[in-house]
Amino acid sequence: YKSGFMSTINFSKDGLILEKSDLTTPDAIKIHKNIKDSLESDAIYIAMEASSHGLEQDRLIGLDIDYAILTSFSHDHLDYHGDIQSYQSAKEKLFLDLNPKKNIVCIDSSFGKKLHSKLLKNNKETYSISIKENADFHASFEKSPIGLKVNLKAFEKNHTFELKTFSRYLASNIICSMAVLILEGVKLSEISKIAKDIVLPQGRLERIIKNQQVIYIDYAHTPEALECTLKELNNMHNEPIWCLFGCGGNRDKDKRPLMGKIAQKYSNHVVLTNDNPRDEDEMDIINDILSEIKEMEQISINLDRKDAIESSILEMERNHINGVLLIAGKGHENYQEVNDNLYELNDKNIINSL
C-alpha cells in the first residue's frame, strides 16, 4: 500500500522523502496540505507524529483519526507545559478529544497504564501493548546476530521473528505499528516474514564500527530514553561504556540533573558537551547537569561537540580502551543551534570523517 508519513525527521510519500521537518507536528495548514498531497498520490495510509505542543495548540483539530497510539511517556517539554500533569493532559487530548476510532496504548509507563484505564472506562475501543507484562499485544526479546529475536503474542497467537535493532525501546515502538496492521486484518505470519527488512530511522541506537571501536548514535534526550539506552548497552556489552551527551538550551531544565545522575550511574565515563545550547550560557547547562553529581572522577567536559566526539574516540583508541561509546541526544540531526544560528553538524559525519 502507498503511504504518507509526517515525523520529526521528514515528510515522505511512498518512501520518497519530500522535505525535511522542523516541527514534529506541522501547523494545521501544512498538515492538511501534506495529507492532500499524499491522497493525490494514491496513498491509502497516512501516519504522523502528534507532539504535545501540536495537541495543545489544536494543530490536529478536524482530522479523522483511525488509530491513536501512545508508544511511551517521558519527562520532557516542561519548559512549555509547566508541570508533568499539564504535559500528560496535552497527550490525552489525542485520545479523549480527537475521538480516534481505535486506541493502542503501551502500558509500560505509569501514564500509559492510567491512560489505558481511563479510555476503557470511557468505553473507547482500546488495546494494550507491553514488553513487561501481559497485554493484548505482548512481546519478549532475545539477542540475535542481527539485533533482536522477538516473540510476539497477539490474540492468543504467537510468532517469532527478527528485527534489525538492538533497542528494546525501539522494538516496542515497532510492535505498536504492527498492532495497527494486525487490527487492519494483516496476518501476523505475513508481518513476521517482512520484519527483518524493516528500515529503521537514522540515529536510533545506530551502530557504527570505526577502527574496531563500537560506537552508537542515539536520539535519547530525556531521562527515560537515556536510561533505557544505557541499560540496553549494559545488557549487550561487558566492556566499559562511555556516554557523551548534553542538554538543550532554553528547554526543560528539570531533566538536566536527572540525566546527569543516570549517565553517571550506567556509564564508566561521561563526556558532557553541547546539544543545541541556543542562547543559554553553555556552562549554565553543564552545571545544571552536574548539580546532583557528587563524584567528578568519571566526568569530563568538552563544550565543542565535534571535538568532544573526535577526542573521545581517539582517547579510547590511544589508551586501548576496548569499550563502547554512546553519543546521545542529537541522533539524525544535522545542525547545532547556537544564538539563533544553525551550524552544520552531524554526529555520524563526524565519526566517518576520522
Feature map (PLM): residue ranges:
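Short beta-strand-centered segment that lines the nucleotide-binding/catalytic pocket of NTP-utilizing
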Residues: Y1-K13
